[in-house]
Every structure is written in structure tokens, then in C-alpha cells.
Regions:
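N-terminal cap/lid segment of alpha/beta-hydrolase-fold proteins
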Residues: 1-34
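Short beta-strand immediately N-terminal to the catalytic nucleophile in serine-hydrolase-like folds
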Residues: 106, 128-130, 155
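Short, surface-exposed "cap/lid" segments of acyl-processing enzymes
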Residues: 30-75
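Structural signature of beta-strand start/N-cap positions in the alpha/beta core
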Residues: 72, 125-127, 151
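Glycine-rich "HGGG/HGxG" loop immediately N-terminal to the catalytic nucleophile
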Residues: 49-52, 74-100
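Alpha/beta-hydrolase-fold enzymes
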Residues: 140-176
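Gly/Ala-rich beta-loop-alpha elbow adjacent to hydrolase catalytic centers
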Residues: 130-134, 138
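Conserved acidic catalytic loop of the alpha/beta-hydrolase fold
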Residues: 104-125
Length: 176
């Protein structure tokens, strides 16, 4: 990687007692921030953001690649993932609790970080990129905040398939 990148890590409050981990990468020389060149990544339901967007494969992560091209790049961990607040329910047996990060709560986390970035950079909009479950989360966030989104990018959305649905496999056993 030839360009010098700055990495910052911070937390953003979402709700009382819930802090969301955020990582930011940008060129060290980056001083002017614009809506068109600011990006927020959100992970799916399995792994936190940095493991999907900031693992340096071949020496450079996806975040590094975009940041080295002049973008101000952020990723966040939804509550219960990675370095964000671990809900109390995670200390109890799983059968005692519903899923930890439900979609409405995750959208609150994303919206809190979205508003934080807009205020921090003095911009009115930014680009959203979601992966898997993050596609659903980012779509809802974009619908609820259309005036704050330049573009919505969906990477591997869960509802688009090129193979027949297993729910409609026809008569007989699935063979699993």
C-alpha cells in the first residue's frame, strides 16, 4: 500500500448503555470531506465489520483500497458484535433470550453512527454499503433517512438468488 492511511477507532452512543464501535480509514492528506466520497460499511449477521471489510488480504483490505482512492471510510459493529457493547443477555444461556441484535435495534445503531459521521465531517449525506443482513439494515436506514443517503450499495443481499429456492423444492424430501 503506497498511500499513507490514518486509522481511527471510536465508540458512538446508540441508546443508554449501548456504545457502537466505529473504525475510520482515510488518507493522511485527506482534509476536505464530501458526501460523494464518504462511505459507511455494515456487516451481516455472522461476523463484525472489521473481519469483513478490514482484513488485509494480499496486503490490503477493502477499506484500505477505498480509502487509498480518496474516500473517507467507516465501518461499525452492531450491538453484540465485535467491539460494540455486549448486551447483558449474552451472559445468560441462549434459550433464555431472543436474538440479541434485532433489525430495529441494529437500525438505531446505524442511524446513530450515520448522524455522528455527518456531524463530524460537516456533510449532509453519505454512501451506505451493506453485506448480507447488513443489506436489509442499510435499506431500512436509507428508507428512513432518504435525505442523508447518496447511494445504497448492497453486497450479497440475502433475498436475491440465482438458484431455485429450497422452500419451493417441490414434492418429496429435500435430500439434506
Amino acid at each position: 500500500m503506497s498511500a499513507s492511511l490514518v486509522t481511527e477507532e471510536m465508540t458512538v452512543p446508540s441508546e443508554p448503555g449501548i456504545d457502537i464501535f466505529v473504525r475510520n480509514k482515510r488518507l493522511a492528506s485527506h482534509a476536505v470531506f464530501t458526501a460523494e466520497r464518504t462511505v459507511l460499511f455494515v456487516h451481516g449477521s455472522t461476523y463484525p465489520a472489521h473481519t469483513g471489510f478490514d482484513i488485509p488480504l494480499g496486503g490490503q483490505s477493502w477499506m484500505d483500497n477505498i480509502a487509498s482512492r480518496g474516500y473517507d471510510v467507516y465501518c461499525l459493529d452492531v450491538r453484540g458484535y465485535g467491539r460494540s457493547t455486549r448486551p447483558k443477555a449474552m451472559s445468560e444461556p441462549p434459550q433464555n433470550n431472543p436474538p440479541l441484535a434485532r433489525t430495529p435495534d441494529a437500525v438505531k445503531d446505524i442511524t446513530a453512527v450515520l448522524n455522528f459521521i455527518l456531524k463530524r465531517r460537516g456533510i449532509a449525506k453519505l454512501n451506505l454499503i451493506g453485506w448480507s443482513w447488513g443489506c436489509s439494515l442499510m435499506a431500512i436506514t436509507a428508507i428512513q433517512n432518504p435525505d442523508k443517503v447518496v447511494r445504497l450499495v448492497q453486497y450479497a443481499p440475502g433475498w436475491l438468488r440465482t438458484t431455485p429456492s429450497l422452500l419451493n423444492a417441490g414434492p418429496g424430501p429435500l435430500g439434506a
